[in-house]
Design a protein with these regions (language model features):
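Transmembrane helical elements of multi-pass membrane transporters/channels
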Residues: 16-36, 164-171, 188-208, 220-286, ...
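Hydrophobic alpha-helical transmembrane segments
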Residues: 128-133, 161-210, 374-381, 393-420
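Membrane-interface junctions at transmembrane-helix termini in multi-pass inner-membrane proteins
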Residues: 139-163, 290-291, 346-373
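Interfacial segments at transmembrane-helix termini and the short loops linking adjacent helices
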Residues: 115-133, 258, 321-349, 396
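Small-residue hotspots at the loop-to-helix junctions and early N-terminal turns
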Residues: 48-56, 131, 258-269, 338-342
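Interhelical loop/hinge segments that connect adjacent transmembrane helices in multipass membrane
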Residues: 1-14, 158, 162, 186-193, ...
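Membrane-water interface segments that mark the loop-to-transmembrane alpha-helix transition
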Residues: 17-29, 54, 63-117, 129, ...
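Helix-loop junctions and terminal segments of transmembrane helices
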Residues: 66-82, 152-153, 212, 271-295, ...
Length: 448
């Protein structure tokens, strides 16, 4: 076999997976990325501060309302995916649990939101409107999670991604129409996003009804099974739900003006550039290392992490040398953030490598009971010390904390990898694979 033939056989399937990602999930992710960046450029700073806080809080609330419940459908059904009444009953049980979680969490979340934004002096009417949007959208996001899990379970990924693409490109197209008509304001930016979430929820609901063909009945026994499987992940779900938006929450609490909030919100939109590429890790990196012969793992582990590390550091270096490239993306309202934009790109580069390490470690079953525990304890300790000792009213100090947290995550994941090579992987006790669970790093779940 010639070198060219070997190279073709190696790269052809991977390029095919990249093409599938680009034409499916990648389009939806890119559409949402462009939508968010356009809102940064178009909306006034004061309005974008509201936009950023609302959707950051919504992202955390969506994770808190799920706490891993929807991801239990695959493991509980197992190989009985053709037993449609069983699947329908589990979905009905999921929905009833979701209702109880929503009724329990949403009032507390509403109170916390009011306390969070009270320093911004946005007025009772504005905060009430934001709460309405928050609670309505969070509910439909839960509907999407429950019924979207049915499409994944029944391997109807084409329709699953089609709903996302239509919603993403539809909202982006309408935003462009309003922009051409010079009619974009904060209400347009928010309501188009809400419409996207609602359309996705209805799309998944209708498709799941078609796939199942039967109406399920909830049962206490199935609800107990769901909770039994989901409860061990609740602490980490809560932790990552708050961590994903922590920097914006901190600047909202400690910042002196809405411009500081808008600056952090705009800067963190740039994080999503690398997040777009991290979506390919479950498609390319995870199966590549999961199927690799043990003798080849160590060399390829070092090689892949080194190459990716060099590439993302070059990317971060561009931000320090040519910050105007990224400032142009944000628009002229943020031209004063040349050093801050370099810091946020550096943190996103570190987070990308940390996520890559997590993905490889998961593929090789380098997962241990102390892994998440040490991540949570050390991160909370770091953040507690910084909140106590550092003035977090400035954008720059908040970004320094973000870099420190990303570096800590990187070091922990690197330590887990080294430990895995020394001690060995966890013993496989379950036939459930990553495709059944929708493998993604905790950082990606939180940001998503």
């Amino acid at each position: 076999m010639t070198t060219i033939t070997r190279a073709r056989d190696f790269f052809a399937p991977k390029l095919r997976h990249v093409a599938q990602f680009t034409t499916r999930q990648g389009i939806a992710v890119a559409g949402n990325l462009v939508y968010g960046l356009l809102c940064v450029r178009i909306l006034p700073v004061a309005d974008y501060a509201k936009f950023a806080v609302l959707f950051a809080y919504m992202g955390s609330l969506t994770v808190l309302l799920d706490v891993g419940i929807s991801s239990t459908l695959g493991p509980l059904v197992g190989e009985q995916i053709d037993n449609l009444p069983l699947v329908a009953n589990y979905v009905a049980s999921l929905r009833r649990l979701a209702l109880w979680v929503y009724l329990g969490v949403s009032p507390l979340a509403a109170i916390c939101f009011v306390l969070l934004v009270q320093k911004q002096h946005w007025g009772a009417a504005v905060v009430a409107q934001m709460l309405l949007v928050l609670l309505v959208t969070a509910w439909f996001a839960r509907v999407s999670s429950s019924y979207g899990a049915v499409l994944i379970l029944r391997r109807d990924r084409a329709y699953y991604y089609r709903v996302q693409i239509i919603g993403s490109l539809g909202s982006l197209g309408l935003l462009l129409v309003f922009w051409l008509l010079h009619s974009v304001n904060i209400y347009v930016g928010i309501l188009l996003n809400v419409a996207q979430d609602i359309s996705m929820a209805f799309g998944y609901f209708r498709r799941s009804q078609h796939l199942l063909g039967v109406k399920g009945e909830p049962s206490a026994q199935q609800e107990r099974a769901i909770l039994h499987l989901a409860m061990p992940n609740v602490p980490s779900s809560i932790f990552y739900a708050t961590q994903g938006q922590l920097m914006l929450i901190l600047i909202t609490i400690f910042g002196h003006s809405a411009s500081s909030v808008a600056n952090i919100g705009a800067l963190f939109r740039l994080n999503q550039i690398l997040m777009f590429f991290s979506q390919m890790n479950p498609i390319l990196v995870h199966p590549f290392f999961a199927r690799m012969q043990e003798a080849r793992v160590r060399r390829n582990y070092v090689l892949v992490v080194s190459i990716v590390g060099i590439l993302v550091m070059v990317y971060a270096g561009l931000a320090f040398l040519y910050p105007w490239l990224f400032l142009w993306i944000l628009g002229p309202k943020y031209n004063s953030l040349s050093f801050e934009v370099s810091l946020v790109i550096l943190s996103s580069a570190i987070q990308y490598v940390a996520g890559l390490l997590w993905m490889i470690n998961s593929a090789r079953r380098f997962t241990y009971w102390w892994n998440n525990l040490s991540q949570i304890i050390l991160t909370l300790l770091l953040e507690g010390i910084v909140v106590w000792k550092v003035d977090l009213s400035t954008v720059r100090n908040v970004l320094y904390l973000n870099i420190a947290g990303a570096t800590l995550t990187l070091l922990i994941n690197l330590g887990v990898g080294i430990y895995g090579f020394i001690v060995g992987p966890q013993k496989l006790e379950s036939p459930i694979g990553p495709d059944d669970l929708g493998m993604a790093s905790p950082e990606e779940h939180a940001a998503g």
